[in-house]
Amino acid sequence: MTTLGTALTPKATKVMMLGSGELGKEVVIELQRLGVEVIAVDRYKNAPAQQVAHRSYTISMLDGEALKALVEKERPDYIVPEVEAIATATLVELEQKGFTVVPTAKATQLTMNREGIRRLAAEELGLPTSNYQFVDNFTDFKSAVENIGIPCVVKPIMSSSGHGQSIIKSFDQIQQAWDYAQQGGRAGAGRVIVEGFVKFDYEITLLTVRHIGGTSFLAPIGHRQQNGDYRESWQPQAMSEIALQKAQQVAEKITSALGGRGIFGVEMFVCGDEVIFNEVSPRPHDTGMVTLISQELSEFALHARAILGLPIPEINLISPAASKAIVVEGKSTQVQFGNLEQVLAEPNTNIRLFGKTEVDGHRRMGVILSRDISVEKALEKAFRAYDKLEINL
């Protein structure tokens, strides 16, 4: 039987979030709805989840000693990684000492870089993937591009939101792609993956929840990427029954291998009735923000329930829905959003502004959420609302 304490009391149930972005912010809110005490950690001050947590700390989460000291100080019941750039060897050590890492320290360690998860998926589990090769110097990189063939996709083994990712369409782009990958890695320059270009009809995220009662799947989410970063997502993505069954089988295999409880974002390419595994994140997924309006329980509420060992008897889709990322370009420490009365005049439409304190280049600062009788109409509505939004730097 699950017992939850009350926040800010001696018997509080405590969760430490490692990473405090917009996805973590929603998880914090859902945990607090259940009376949980939340500590938010990030590498910079006033990150979105820190703004709503009970307490916050600013450290380099790649510093294992600093991370260990903080965990020993707070002694949380659950450690919940929200980003890849964490000293995962320290998480393994903490788990061995009796701390609970969500979903597991192994899952966090394997998925923190693309090499660990790709080798697990393709070489151990035999899941269908694109052709690939890992390299750590420019000479081997050129050879890998020749072996894989053009076009091909280049990614740092450790990055998020499309940073460092590019597509090589001609041989004269090889140096540029290498340099961009070296600049975009979360932990600095280093190893990259060269992937064969996959011909596909569409991409999906199959959110998969491992919980006390078993494994459950959300309705598939379609999405559009730009430079490796999500721009729009919608739910449900129409797909054949055969393709959906195959996608669920792939998701079941990879999440079972990772273990633990919580939500996983399993990314796949779909071509006809065939599915190809791409990546998996052992945490809520950015494309899954659409569930804030499409479902009775969002991916964040489901994650909170799964973490705490609470049941998830069913997952209900309210209606077709879409999300449109608000990406701000420029340089500012005082971004303002205007004309919101017109944005929210669209029925069954909402907006989330993440509270990120600055932008330097381009950054996702919010999301428009819309519901309608079809995915197409929901997308149209989200775009209409977005077009009315005023952004002032």
From Swiss-Prot:
| ATP-grasp domain: residues covered | 119-308
Q: Which GO terms describe its molecular function?
A: ATP binding; magnesium ion binding; phosphoribosylglycinamide formyltransferase 2 activity; phosphoribosylglycinamide formyltransferase activity
* GO cellular component terms given for this protein: cytosol
Pathway it belongs to? Purine metabolism; IMP biosynthesis via de novo pathway; N(2)-formyl-N(1)-(5-phospho-D-ribosyl)glycinamide from N(1)-(5-phospho-D-ribosyl)glycinamide (formate route): step 1/1
Biological process per Gene Ontology, one example term: 'de novo' IMP biosynthetic process
Keyword S-adenosyl-L-methionine included in the entry's annotation: no
**What does the entry list as the binding residues for N(1)-(5-phospho-beta-D-ribosyl)glycinamide?**
22-23, 82, 286, 356, 363-364
List positions binding Mg(2+): 267, 279
Enzymatic reactions: N(1)-(5-phospho-beta-D-ribosyl)glycinamide + formate + ATP = N(2)-formyl-N(1)-(5-phospho-beta-D-ribosyl)glycinamide + ADP + phosphate + H(+)
Binding-site positions, ATP: 114, 155, 160-165, 195-198, 203
Is Magnesium one of the keywords?
A: yes
Quote the EC number.
Answer: 6.3.1.21
Q: Which family does it belong to?
A: Belongs to the PurK/PurT family.
Q: What does this protein do?
A: Involved in the de novo purine biosynthesis. Catalyzes the transfer of formate to 5-phospho-ribosyl-glycinamide (GAR), producing 5-phospho-ribosyl-N-formylglycinamide (FGAR). Formate is provided by PurU via hydrolysis of 10-formyl-tetrahydrofolate.
According to the record's subunit comment, the protein's assembly and interactions are:
Homodimer.
PANTHER family per the UniProt record, alphabetical:
FORMATE-DEPENDENT PHOSPHORIBOSYLGLYCINAMIDE FORMYLTRANSFERASE (PTHR43055:SF1)
Name the chain's protein: Formate-dependent phosphoribosylglycinamide formyltransferase
Q: Which organism is it from?
A: Mannheimia succiniciproducens (strain KCTC 0769BP / MBEL55E)
